[in-house]
Amino acid sequence: MSSVKRSPKQEIVTQFHCSAAEGDIAKLTGILSHSPSLLNETSENGWTALMYAARNGHPEIVQFLLEKGCDRSIVNKSRQTALDIAVFWGYKHIANLLATAKGGKKPWFLTNEVEECENYFSKTLLDRKSEKRNNADWLLAKESHPATVFILFSDLNPLVTLGGNKESFQQPEVRLCQLNYKDIKDYLAQPEEITLIFLGVELEMKDKLLNYAGEVPREEEDGLVAWFALGIDPIAAEEFKQRHENCYFLHPPMPALLQLKEKEAGVVAQARSVLAWHSRYKFCPTCGNGTKIEEGGYKRVCLKEDCPSLNGVHNTSYPRVDPVVIMQVIHPDGTRCLLGRQKRFPPGMFTCLAGFIEPGETIEDAVRREVEEESGVKVGHVQYVSCQPWPMPSSLMIGCLAVAVSTEIKVDKNEIEDARWFTREQVLDVLTKGKQQAFFVPPSRAIAHQLIKHWIRINPNL
């Protein structure tokens, strides 16, 4: 049988792949210097030079190709990446090189354009006006201003009421109870029993200020409607509810907080996170003595005169935010995604993997570490998408897309209960039909849902 005649390009691709398979670094370098476009060229079976080097145990070739920026996420016709091949043939050193390499070419199915979006808990009614936090006289005047808005909390649960048309078949809208000075002045008279936080001023000037023109001297009116969060103890909260039968404290936090109007949810996220910090830091982390609240609720100051925390700026004196990575892990071929579940989840719910960023760690490295720890899957390229404040009690969810460079799942049962690859079609069915399917994902107001939808929207014709 006569052999099929190859084109000049096919011939040079074959030579390039053979040099990788044979470990001939000199020949490989020479070919690539004349034809750099060959770096990610595939053979008829979908293999790249990187795959041939991984299959035949040539770490120096693998290292060279990685330094040139080859794409580790390419899959062959057997749905294997170069890392999968190295692991299968037992080349641990090469597998480690492929798993830990950074940079490289962005996978073809990811776009360069990432539209900025506002997730739930991100929108707000307020300008925080941080420059007013040190102005004690201004804050005191605003506390008693008739237009000032107070939102009440007990055990970090906001006081709400049902809005909208109660005769409608739709679920009633949950809204914050916006209280005024007269409603809560008795609590303000007992500062040692409450926690008061200045949240900011309304972004839009309100006509309601005109209603109080006679109550506030004109020279003292600055046109700003201030908002405060007020934390009270459970006994006081119960007494307040008895006097206001149409109000109740919204709990448990999840999923109850997802019922709020979007802009009010942003206010609650701010207030709840700061109140949670105060509930945990009543005593100085440096020396153990008591502390007092300053700067409108955004600082705690130690009462001990010689405490080191009084010298300089210390992060223990200010509200903390815990950064968390949450990632939509994409299969190397771009057609599937990795979702997992914890034991505490409702039956059938799967979501994006997530975990806290550790000290001295980048977002990208945290994504790679968490995915591998929980699922055993190795990740290469990481791309930021959007973020979401998450007041449980004070996290910032940093949403990313992460492209896998291996496909075998090995779940750590101490981390999660299960993890699986789901096809684009399966995920689309879940997004359009909801819980009618065999599994479901978090609601639309969770960033995990938005990351999943973001993946579906890119390259929809795959």
UniProtKB/Swiss-Prot annotation:
The keyword Hydrolase applies. PROSITE patterns: ANK_REP_REGION, ANK_REPEAT, NUDIX, NUDIX_BOX. This is NAD-capped RNA hydrolase NUDT12. Mg(2+) 2 binds at E370. GO terms for molecular function: magnesium ion binding; NAD+ diphosphatase activity; NADH pyrophosphatase activity; NADPH pyrophosphatase activity; RNA NAD-cap (NMN-forming) hydrolase activity; zinc ion binding. It is an enzyme of class 3 (hydrolase). It is found in: Cytoplasm; Peroxisome; Cytoplasmic granule. Binds 3 Mg(2+) ions per subunit. Binds 1 zinc ion per subunit. Mg(2+) 1 binds at A354, E374, E415. One of its GO terms (cellular component) is peroxisome. It comes from Macaca fascicularis (Crab-eating macaque). A motif (Microbody targeting signal) lies at residues 460-462. Residues 319-453 form the Nudix hydrolase domain. Signal peptide: none annotated. It catalyses: a 5'-end NAD(+)-phospho-ribonucleoside in mRNA + H2O = a 5'-end phospho-adenosine-phospho-ribonucleoside in mRNA + beta-nicotinamide D-ribonucleotide + 2 H(+); NAD(+) + H2O = beta-nicotinamide D-ribonucleotide + AMP + 2 H(+); NADH + H2O = reduced beta-nicotinamide D-ribonucleotide + AMP + 2 H(+); NADPH + H2O = reduced beta-nicotinamide D-ribonucleotide + adenosine 2',5'-bisphosphate + 2 H(+).
